[in-house]
């Protein structure tokens, strides 16, 4: 071999000298190459041994890290394009009007009252004429779902149209909520839902009277209801599917109705009067005006007859700041006491009653809280009621699986959870329960007097 060729080869590959010591980086690169080679061979071998691995879908996709800006932007852009495409697939107002016109044109007499009806044959004809966007609604399954007792085998045009409208609204709302899903995982964090509601406020005529300075308190009040009931494990996020499935969003969007009755506003947690009521109560309790509630200030809540023992447990278990409660924690407290029949509220109160943290209430737990009721009765000049009688009544009402223990599920299943918890934490509630027969008789007498007049 010519010496020139040898020299050229040596200069072209300086690392080929076996005597030369490899650098640390070169060793790492070589190790990585070997690892990749052997791992690929092993992985390929696994695939060859079992063909079913090819059919298993990928179920984990790593989210971009904070420093991976390009990947984050790509993910955001792709999600935005996807949601825009989904939005274009929905029926717009003009297409909905056209659908209504086609349905009305193909109705089949006779009408039932003022309800226009349509049979399956014409139902399919409308589906062909309505266009590709409507295809999903014109199926045998949908027709059968809406078919009730019509002797001609028809369905109500209005019921079908309302079904389509509801579906379109659900998809629109899901897309709207998904725009605030920063992670793109089908969940909304507290800050995500806050942003959604904050941007929704200007579209709700019933909230026009709210001052902008109150917006942050309104948003906090609204968001807490979603998280109190839909996030029982306190993970800090709730599924978009759960938001759509519950009635809270319907209640919130009901505020678009400019002619909403006063009664409806009073019973709607999201209405301006309700939010102002809750916040006003908080301000009235805050006597030292420091923006927080102490145990003494909270003791004046409602009829001011809650026991000190129960209030102690509230401040032991709930999040506080230097022993005082902020507005967000207060909202959880209010939601629990105002909705005692709901499982989420019972879970909140049960945790406070379970002083031994055993997951159940026993005779000791019941006696611990009822003694405080007996003490308040003495202070108010009433004869204390025997604990044994109350204990027997509670166990008779709940009928727990274990005759000596009451679990949270026992309380929920009994449908008496609100009564039991009221008896144990509030003197006024206990007095109302104890005198229920006299109160019912008094109401009947008053009703009879009104009838006589």
Swiss-Prot record:
Superkingdom, taxonomy of origin: Eukaryota
Alphabetic keyword roster: Calcium, Cytoplasm, Metal-binding, Nucleus, Repeat
One family name in Pfam for this protein: EF-hand_13
Residues bound to Ca(2+): 286, 288, 290, 292, 297
GO molecular function, one term: metal ion binding
Keyword Metal-binding among UniProt keywords: yes
GO cellular component, one term: cytoplasm
Cellular compartments annotated: Nucleus; Cytoplasm
Positions of the UniProt region annotated as Disordered: 1-27
Entries under Gene3D superfamilies matching the protein: 1.10.238.220, EF-hand (1.10.238.10)
One GO BP annotation of this record: spleen development
Predominant location: nucleus
Complexes and interactors: Interacts with MCM3AP/GANP, PPP5C, and the phosphatase 2A core enzyme composed of the PPP2CA catalytic subunit and the constant regulatory subunit PPP2R1A. Finds in a complex with ABCB1, TFPI2 and PPP2R3C; leading to the dephosphorylation of ABCB1.
PANTHER family in alphabetical order: SERINE/THREONINE-PROTEIN PHOSPHATASE 2A REGULATORY SUBUNIT B'' SUBUNIT GAMMA, SERINE_THREONINE-PROTEIN PHOSPHATASE 2A REGULATORY SUBUNIT B'' SUBUNIT GAMMA
Function: May regulate MCM3AP phosphorylation through phosphatase recruitment. May act as a negative regulator of ABCB1 expression and function through the dephosphorylation of ABCB1 by TFPI2/PPP2R3C complex. May play a role in the activation-induced cell death of B-cells.
Protein name: Serine/threonine-protein phosphatase 2A regulatory subunit B'' subunit gamma
Species of the source: Rattus norvegicus
